Amino acid sequence: MEKLLIKGGKSLSGQIDCSGAKNAALPVIAASILSSDDITLKNLPYLQDITTMFELIGSMGADISLDEKMNFKLNTSNLSNLEARYELVKTMRASILVLGSMVAKYGYAKIALPGGCAIGSRPVNYHLKALEKLGAEISLNNGYIEAKAKKLIGANIEFEGVTVTGTENLMMAASLAEGLTTLTNVAKEPEISDLADFLNSMGAKISGAGTDEIRIEGVEELTGTTFKIPADRIEAGTYLVAAAVTNGKITINKIDPTRMGSIIETLQKAGAEVDSNGNSISLDMTKDAIKPVDIVTAPFPGFPTDMQAQFTVLNCIGSGESSVTETIFENRFMHVQELNRMGTDITINGTTALINGVDSISGAQVMATDLRASASLILAGLIAKGETIVDRIYHIDRGYERIEEKLSNLGAEIIRLPN
């Protein structure tokens, strides 16, 4: 397996461009199944999860091509295999996103129960119960979800728990359902609004995305479209934390700051100077020491669970005590054991990490366990004394585009070691 070798101690400085958002791109690719026309997607990030999603719809019969401007063109009009096989689904939980599109467009879907990051229970039962309310017949057999429907019918659906992918799945399914569907207790993440924008550009009638209630008036068919994937707020947040922990000064371009309110606010509480305009964010941590910040993850617009591992590293080198409480997913502190091997002082108490700040940490060989945990280990390597080797970096390649290249451009000493 490839590894990353990091020599710590360099302050980050300079500018980078933010990549397209994986969490916006994956549902958009899944939603392309709803149209029989050509779909052109711009600003797709080069990530393993994107490749896996293309392999998934390609295995069903989708036609996928890349033009001279590096835009992807998709056509799913001739899907002949309505099964998402375990070999692909096991590597990525977001593969469940094709369920709503397939049953709405083709009346049938067979999808292996999903895999992906090993961070606890992410139940798909919210998706399945909601699809049943639209009239789908759902069965679970031999590790596969099987869904059938002659025609989905609009309904009033209140999710039992807030679910991003569940909200997205139902938005897709309801777009081709007969009549009005109302979704409540929905996720409000920016990527929900992105999916609504994409579907509406295809002719869907969706309103309320980003609010407490989403209304979808079903239509007969959806057309082709051209859509640009928005920038990745989690990638931007990760690089801002990287600059903060290295007492650096950076600017991230091509990012909408309004999507990052809680991240920016938390960085400011930690002592960073953060400025933004309509298309960039600048952070300066050269004038102050890090102040630890208590964090509780929450659905958007609260603090994102996908940033808690990175801010845990920030708190580790702040002066004093702090806590990070995870309310979204189980088992999302698997990076803590590896961080403690580098000299941090973190104790887990249930769903809370109790952190005592330390003066310094030391490089070590560490192992990534999931996507955001791997990001935290890289951040720790940037500030550690000596060399850090991060193993199993296939996790990082699922969600960060060319991370070693971008960090190197900001002054970090980091290289990828071959197998």
Go through each PLM region and give its residues.
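Short, structured segments at the rim of ligand-binding sites
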Residues: M1-N419
